[in-house]
Amino acid sequence: MSAKAISEQTGKELLYKYICTTSAIQNRFKYARVTPDTDWARLLQDHPWLLSQSLVVKPDQLIKRRGKLGLVGVNLTLDGVKSWLKPRLGQEATVGKATGFLKNFLIEPFVPHTQEEEFYVCIYATREGDYVLFHHEGGVDVGDVDAKAQKLLVAVDEKLNPEDIKKHLLVHAPEDKKEILASFISGLFNFYEDLYFTYLEINPLVVTKDGVYILDLAAKVDATADYICKVKWGDIEFPPPFGREAYPEEAYIADLDAKSGASLKLTLLNPKGRIWTMVAGGGASVVYSDTICDLGGVNELANYGEYSGAPSEQQTYDYAKTILSLMTREKHPDGKILIIGGSIANFTNVAATFKGIVRAIRDYQGPLKEHEVTIFVRRGGPNYQEGLRVMGEVGKTTGIPIHVFGTETHMTAIVGMALGHRPIPNQPPTAAHTANFLLNASGSTSTPAPSRTASFSESRTDEVAPAKKAKPAMPQDSVPSPRPLQGKSATLFSRHTKAIVWGMQTRAVQGMLDFDYVCSRDEPSVAAMVYPFTGDHKQKFYWGHKEILIPVFKNMADAMKKHPEVDVLINFASLRSAYDSTMETMNYTQIRTIAIIAEGIPEALTRKLIKKAEQKGVTIIGPATVGGIKPGCFKIGNTGGMLDNILASKLYRPGSVAYVSRSGGMSNELNNIISRTTDGVYEGVAIGGDRYPGSTFMDHVLRYQDTPGVKMIVVLGEIGGTEEYKICRGVTEGRITKPVVCWCIGTCAAMFSSEVQFGHAGACANQASETAVAKNQALKEAGVFVPRSFDELGEIIQSVYEDLVARGVIVPAQEVPPPTVPMDYSWARELGLIRKPASFMTSICDERGQELIYAGMPITEVFKEEMGIGGVLGLLWFQKRLPKYSCQFIEMCLMVTADHGPAVSGAHNTIICARAGKDLVSSLTSGLLTIGDRFGGALDAAAKMFSKAFDSGIIPMEFVNKMKKEGKLIMGIGHRVKSINNPDMRVQILKDYVRQHFPATPLLDYALEVEKITTSKKPNLILNVDGLIGVAFVDMLRHCGSFTREEADEYIDIGALNGIFVLGRSMGFIGHYLDQKRLKQGLYRHPWDDISYVLPEHMSM
């Protein structure tokens, strides 16, 4: 959603902070909020003026006409305010059809004034600009301001100056107040623009001799501008409309939505309701709600929501478990229904999202059975067969009744089944597997089809009979612009269209190339890509079986210069970059069409794009769209889904039906419906779900009217806006003569007691004429073919098509099979069609899922269990969860081996490298490369040597004598500095810990007996730290209970123990590197006097 209402308190706080005007605004920041939890003593301490002034009190919960409802207390003392609040605060009230609790009130100073000092001011956004309304008689009885007020349109990118205000708005205002009003309205408009408001109303605005008072205020801001206005807005709150509570679950889903690139929405309508929905797609979610309400389920509909934009399995799981948790809290005598619906996805992996839902169903299978929940599923899109399979499987394994349907079933048919209006088929038709389409594309003969390169009736000149006409039922203000109806160029795309793709969207580009290939285009439609975050290079793609290279440019200018044949740009930039990149694109005259995919571009910026596009003669599709498709010619990005859907919906060749919709998912559903009921799609465009799409329904309908190959037009309209009325006008005035089938979704909105913002930003009616019901009625009366519901849309399309065929306007042609396109390896593997031995294997770590996993343990569990470094090392090195004492011992080993001064070879090398100006990694590596048999490598050797002696059964004295006889050193014995008289405290600390905590220490005991023998000969032949760690580690591996004897011996043999020294000493080496850098030590050169130069005598003579 884009425009969101804010509370009066928030609106005034922002206005008082940021408005710039010469008018003296009084009572700045004088307001106090009261809730049922308010501490009055604290309130009086924070707002002492409450005791000294007369007061006004009113609810601040987005309630209109509070004065007429008796919800404003005027000219009261503080005690009077308390008395007035007593029967109201926390109590239930009914406002229109909505019933809710009054729990948020605003107290302000009372302003004595006369009726003549009250004025009305309102600013609101439209496509063309911002309207400023002013009426010289404000207050409770202002009446119909649209009819009475002075109105001034400030066009996009234009400024409002005080002289225009005086001339056009303050015509009837008192002369002595014109100056102050003009200054205030000018400042108010600048404030409105700067903080991205979409609606701002002050009634009354009171102007007295003391200055300006803002008594009542209502406002909406563009929530998508948060990234621009965050500093000024702060943490702004968006309260729910009166009559609907704010639930923590809604806030949780909103938080998930904010953290995700996908779209996740949830609105609770009736938590005790019987019918729950979990629908994929903004448009589809509205259609399902419509159908439920049409079939009499409005009072039982529990929620509205949608998920779209390819959420991950984990995100879908979180969304699903929230809904399942809500619906299993209260029982219903008739059981409950969960509708998991959706249109045909364009790029969302249905199997991945369904696996998240399946996880949630498994987690809640007990409560679901207890509450007698029946689930109905219908979905299509990439890998949907696998998604439906796992959904059906979970029904069998859990015993929950789950009815599963695919694209062979009409999208909303499951609603009728769920509510008992139509039978549930025992065995629905089985859709072909994804791979079947690709391996045998010509197998389906369900629809007669033409060649791939021409429409059925491209060459026919017969004009279609005009649609039947009737008197239009349009409100006078429904068509704001009186300009004549004119279309832009009728052809946006052809078989030779070339495009540049902005963004590293390799999957979308490959999809476009596969579409081009299956349409038998001569060349790929993507000429180049632009991506500012890399240097110029080439990206590899497939053209059928052949690999090709597509250039990627860092700068758009280079791409345009080297590809002058390009006239389309597909913009995949993020919502933060989409505006700037689109503005830059329009500087190049070669570009005639731009598709903006991003959702969430602020409306004010979109209007600037529209204005510049009109000046440049550029057609914009979007924002917030999947794009469009012209079968046999060109497709934008992910439109039409993957190849299986392209082939199933016959999108590889043109038909005779053109459509335009707002929703990307619903456009794919139209592809499916049209392919099943007619000869197929000629062209289809999804203009996007924002309130101000770059191109409108009428722009494309007029193109279709002027395109000979299009014989009938389908429009899927939507609640919000008045664009559909232009179609009515076009039909009645004879500008549109081809048959038009139209249905506006969102009819359910009129049945809800409180306002619901649907999935698309523009799907909200701001006046009666913007409702879907009003628009459908007007279209019907204008002579457009309007079904009774979306359920009947396919039947109406088929009826109109068959009539055109019967009259010879359309002549179906023979199908020509498309070429076979190979399947990508990655997708074939995803579908389970192929297998290949992996080049690498790993068993310690998995980063592919929602969270990192160490040897089977999620990272969250690692921290929850406080496993520490020792525990993590146990997981990654040994794939075992070690006992607590073992983890502690490992950490102690790392501590005692961390460093042993700068004189040892490894530290010395590190210091030399650091002083030579080398980087951290180079310096560390030079130190590590000295580790071997002479330095630090004794851990493994000592462990092996002592283990072999102990396991062979020879006594310590025999072992010492044997090593002496063989002339070998005993590894782990001896120290240059430490001796039995000067013990190494590191050894002592570890030895005491091991003896105290280890269950058994036979090898350590053996080594200590050896030490007694060696020190008796020479005091420095002690068991050193390497030797102690080596033998103690063997004891730990053998006796901690986590390893078999074979596993313990294997870890010793493969050199695991030397890893302890390497890991520990790395900390010290890094310390030495940082120390030298911090001390700013220069290049080291060894002094001559410390080098003995020994040269051959004959060379020195």
From Swiss-Prot:
Region (Disordered): 440-485
InterPro entries: ATP-citrate_synthase, Cit_synth/succinyl-CoA_lig_AS, Citrate-bd, Citrate_synth-like_lrg_a-sub, Citrate_synth-like_sm_a-sub, Citrate_synth_N, Citrate_synthase, Citrate_synthase_sf
GO CC annotation terms, alphabetical: cytosol
Phosphoserine modified-residue sites: 263, 451, 455, 459, 481, 663, 839, 1100
Domain ATP-grasp: 4-265
Cofactor: Mg(2+)
Location of Phosphotyrosine modifications: 131, 682
Cross-link Glycyl lysine isopeptide (Lys-Gly) (interchain with G-Cter in ubiquitin): where in chain: 540, 546, 554
Modified residues annotated as Phosphothreonine in this record: 447, 639
Catalytic activity as recorded in UniProt: oxaloacetate + acetyl-CoA + ADP + phosphate = citrate + ATP + CoA
Keyword Lipid metabolism carried by entry: yes
Residues at which CoA binds: 779-789
GO biological processes: acetyl-CoA biosynthetic process; citrate metabolic process; fatty acid biosynthetic process; lipid biosynthetic process
Location (main, coarse): cytoplasm
N6-acetyllysine PTM sites in chain numbering: 540, 546, 554, 948, 968, 978, 1077
Record: residues binding ATP: 58, 66-67, 109, 111, 118, 216
SUPFAM superfamilies named in the record: Citrate synthase, Glutathione synthetase ATP-binding domain-like, NAD(P)-binding Rossmann-fold domains, Succinyl-CoA synthetase domains
Cited PROSITE patterns: SUCCINYL_COA_LIG_1, SUCCINYL_COA_LIG_2, SUCCINYL_COA_LIG_3
CDD domains: CCL_ACL-C (cd06100)
Positions contributing to citrate binding: 309, 346, 348, 364, 379
Residue stretches of biased makeup (Low complexity): 441-457
UniProt EC number: 2.3.3.8
PTM entry text: Phosphorylated by PKA and GSK3 in a sequential manner; phosphorylation results in activation of its activity. Phosphorylation on Thr-447 and Ser-451 depends on the phosphorylation state of Ser-455. Phosphorylation on Ser-455 is decreased by prior phosphorylation on the other 2 residues. Phosphorylated at Ser-455 by BCKDK and dephosphorylated by protein phosphatase PPM1K. ISGylated.
Superkingdom of origin organism: Eukaryota
Subunit record text: Homotetramer.
Name this polypeptide is given: ATP-citrate synthase
Organism for this UniProt entry: Ovis aries
Gene: ACLY
